[in-house]
C-alpha cells in the first residue's frame, strides 16, 4: 500500500514542488497528471458503476487522492497561466497489473501526449481519456 501511495500521491507532489520554479519561467507550461477512471469519486459513488465494487484503500483511493491534489494544483496555479490537466490512459498493460491490461502502453499514452501538446489556447482543468472523453471527477 505504501509503495502505491508513494508513487501515485507523494511522488507526484515531490516532482510538482521540484519543477514548479522551472514551470513558472515558461510561457507555455503545463502539468499532465496520469490518474485512472477508477479514482473518480463521482463514478465510484454510484453503485451501478462497473468498478464500484473494487474501490478500496490502495490503488483506487490513491488515484482519488491524486485527483484531489491535481485540483489543488489547478486552484493554486489558475492565475499563472500554467495549464493543469488530468488524464486516464485506460487499462494499459503494465507491471502493476501483471501486463494483463487490454491495450499497449503506446495506446495508453495517446491521451497523455495529446493533452501535453495542447496549444496555448487549450483547456485547463480537465479530466479525460482518449479522444478527449470527459471523466467525472
Positions of PLM-derived features:
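Catalytic loop of short-chain dehydrogenase/reductase
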Residues: 1-5, 24-78
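A short, exposed helix-loop element centered on a Lys and neighboring polar residues
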Residues: 16-17, 71
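Conserved sequence/active-site signature of Rossmann-fold short-chain dehydrogenase/reductase
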Residues: 37-39, 92-93, 97
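C-terminal helical subdomain
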Residues: 64, 79, 86-87, 94, ...
Amino acid at each position: 500500500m505504501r509503495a502505491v501511495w508513494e508513487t501515485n500521491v507523494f511522488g507526484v507532489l515531490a516532482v510538482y514542488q521540484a519543477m514548479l520554479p522551472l514551470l513558472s519561467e515558461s510561457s507555455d507550461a503545463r502539468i499532465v497528471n496520469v490518474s485512472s477512471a477508477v479514482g473518480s469519486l463521482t463514478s465510484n459513488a454510484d453503485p451501478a458503476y462497473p468498478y464500484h465494487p473494487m474501490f478500496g484503500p490502495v490503488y483506487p483511493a490513491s488515484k482519488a487522492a491524486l485527483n484531489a491534489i491535481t485540483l489543488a494544483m489547478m486552484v493554486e496555479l489558475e492565475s499563472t497561466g500554467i495549464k493543469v490537466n488530468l488524464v486516464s490512459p485506460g487499462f494499459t498493460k503494465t507491471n502493476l497489473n501483471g501486463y494483463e491490461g487490454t491495450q499497449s502502453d503506446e495506446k495508453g499514452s495517446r491521451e497523455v501526449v495529446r493533452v501535453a501538446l495542447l496549444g496555448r489556447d487549450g483547456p485547463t482543468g480537465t479530466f479525460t481519456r482518449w479522444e478527449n472523453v470527459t471523466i467525472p471527477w
